[in-house]
């Protein structure tokens, strides 16, 4: 039985993963650097030192990873001032979980003000008992720390807590934490590794809701 639900944000609740992929080029250009193929994909779902280490892998150990990430965040902050597109089925899923008194949390690698801004822009904040940002944990996805903290705030056992994720790192984190992990693919389809980790794959949030209603989740 599912006693709580933890939502990833980018690419799961909102169609923002595509946006993040476009932020890297102008962010790097502002520092006189060129975008290197594969960076956006490698960075997907990460935060903090994990994110900076990936930057160093692409631009060398001596690069100013902090400056690069700060530049990325400046581009993102400007773009996220306006409402971003919601994923199909989000409203219906939130309303059903709320009506059935199942507590919800957001656990996202994004910064706190970005999470709050996206939720506030659509009037969704009231649905969530907890918001956990990548800024609040030492280890980012694929480490399960962010999901474990969210479950602690919800007061639920990971074994009975549903994690909804679109990214590979997110699925890895959910599985590592012992959560009921459902992948809802966005930019990347599930591969053999993901199929070996997740509990179930759903094509969209409408299907997640249908599985909850029938008790398959």
Regions found by a protein language model. Give the residues of each.
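Asp-based, Mg2+/Mn2+-dependent phosphohydrolase catalytic module
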Residues: 1-3, 95-98, 111-217
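N-terminal helical cap/lid subdomain that shapes the substrate entry/recognition surface
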Residues: 2-100, 113
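Short, contiguous strand/loop micro-motifs
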Residues: 11-12, 38-39, 80-81, 106, ...
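Conserved SAM-binding loop
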Residues: 13, 44, 104-107, 139, ...
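Conserved catalytic-core motifs of eukaryotic protein kinase domains, centered on the activation segment
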Residues: 18, 108, 117
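Short linear functional motifs in flexible/disordered or boundary regions
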Residues: 23, 36, 63-67, 84, ...
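Homeobox/homeodomain signature
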Residues: 25, 33, 74-76, 105, ...
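Residue-level detector of anion-binding/catalytic polar loops
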Residues: 34, 103, 180
């Amino acid at each position: 039985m599912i006693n709580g639900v933890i939502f990833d944000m980018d690419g799961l609740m909102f169609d923002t993963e595509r946006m993040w992929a476009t932020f890297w080029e102008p962010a790097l250009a502002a520092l006189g650097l060129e975008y290197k193929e594969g960076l956006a994909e490698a960075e997907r779902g990460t935060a903090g030192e994990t994110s900076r280490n990936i930057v160093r892998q692409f631009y060398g150990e001596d690069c100013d990873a902090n400056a690069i990430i700060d530049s990325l965040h400046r581009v993102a902050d400007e773009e996220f001032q306006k409402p971003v597109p919601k994923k199909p089925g989000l409203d219906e899923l939130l309303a059903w979980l709320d009506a059935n008194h199942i507590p919800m949390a957001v656990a996202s690698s994004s910064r706190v003000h970005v999470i709050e801004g996206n939720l506030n822009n659509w009037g969704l904040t009231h649905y969530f008992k907890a918001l956990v940002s990548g800024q609040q944990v030492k280890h980012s996805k694929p480490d399960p720390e962010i999901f474990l903290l969210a479950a602690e705030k919800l007061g639920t056992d990971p074994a009975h807590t549903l994690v909804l994720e679109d990214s590979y790192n997110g699925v890895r984190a959910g599985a590592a934490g012992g959560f009921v992990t459902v992948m809802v693919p966005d930019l990347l389809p599930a591969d053999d590794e993901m199929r070996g980790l997740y509990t179930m794959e759903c094509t969209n949030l409408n299907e997640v809701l249908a599985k909850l209603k029938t008790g398959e989740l």
